[in-house]
Swiss-Prot record:
Active site: 7 (proton acceptor), 131 (proton donor)
EC number: 5.3.1.16
Gene that encodes it: hisA
Localization annotation: Cytoplasm
Catalyzed chemical reaction(s): 1-(5-phospho-beta-D-ribosyl)-5-[(5-phospho-beta-D-ribosylamino)methylideneamino]imidazole-4-carboxamide = 5-[(5-phospho-1-deoxy-D-ribulos-1-ylimino)methylamino]-1-(5-phospho-beta-D-ribosyl)imidazole-4-carboxamide
Originating species: Blochmanniella floridana
HAMAP family: HisA
Protein name: 1-(5-phosphoribosyl)-5-[(5-phosphoribosylamino)methylideneamino] imidazole-4-carboxamide isomerase
Length: 251
């Protein structure tokens, strides 16, 4: 599945370069962008509240509720992240009609609490978002708090930990690629899809060419999240969906 990304700051659709808030590109009204994605065949939207991600007190809940309603009216599924800190945050979003809630830094800083969420909520409604930095020794270290803090926790360690409580969806981003149009880390996705075949992996970061969609699908990922390439009209969602459908999946 191809999932277009919609990142929001102060009610505006934006993209960050490598997660830096000071490196923003603005693309205007999120409703008109959402409408374009609907027209081009979207079946799911990836929405991130970047204000909420930076400070949970600034979550754009009214906007999220309206965008979710618009998505549902258009028969779109929606997954949302940004500033999720409590079980009540998840309940609120699911009540809005959100299909999946994305859990980022909180899953690393408070694993005991988040593992309880996996037993309380349907694991299919939760997405574990792991941003990783790959060092010179090819260690895949998890980065948290909007990519501001590198941990010594390995990607594989986190997946294995949450796999024990029914983990279904993992969104994995190589932060050196995100928002750069520099291409995807195909080897990363090949290895994790091979190791955990029952988990649905979402690839994110750097997709700049339609040919990468072919490579990513053959790597075994369940879906690809694409943001900047659509917003800057490198190719259309319609073209990306067609490319995905024509690709031969590793199954």
């Amino acid at each position: 599945m191809i999932i277009p990304a919609l990142d929001i700051i102060n009610g505006d659709a934006v993209r960050l370069y490598q997660g830096k808030y000071q490196s923003q590109s603005h693309y205007g009204n999120p409703y008109s962008i959402l409408s374009t994605y609907v027209q081009q065949g979207a079946t799911m939207i990836h929405l991130v509240d970047l204000d909420g991600a930076r400070n949970p007190k600034n979550r754009q809940l009214s906007l999220i509720k309206e965008l979710t309603h618009t998505a549902i009216t258009s028969h779109l599924k929606i997954q949302i992240g940004g500033g999720i800190r409590h079980a009540t945050d998840i309940k609120t979003l699911l009540k809005f009609g959100v299909n999946r809630v994305i859990l980022g830094s909180i899953a690393i800083t408070h694993p005991k609490k988040v593992k309880q969420w996996f037993t309380y909520f349907n694991p299919s409604s939760l997405v574990l978002a792991l941003d990783i930095y790959i060092d010179s020794k090819n260690n895949r270290k998890v980065v948290i708090h909007g990519w501001q803090k590198e941990t010594n926790i390995q990607l594989e360690e986190v997946i294995e930990n949450y796999n024990s409580v029914g983990l279904k969806h993992v969104l994995c981003t190589d932060i050196s690629k995100d928002g750069t149009l520099l291409g995807s880390n195909i080897n990363l996705y090949q290895s994790i899809c091979y190791k955990w075949p029952k988990i649905s992996f979402q690839a994110s970061g750097g997709v700049a060419k339609l040919t990468e969609i072919l490579q990513l699908r053959s790597s075994g990922v369940n879906s690809i999240i694409i943001g900047r390439s659509f917003l800057e009209k490198k190719f259309t969602l319609t073209e990306a969906i067609s490319c995905w459908q024509n690709a031969s999946s590793r199954v």
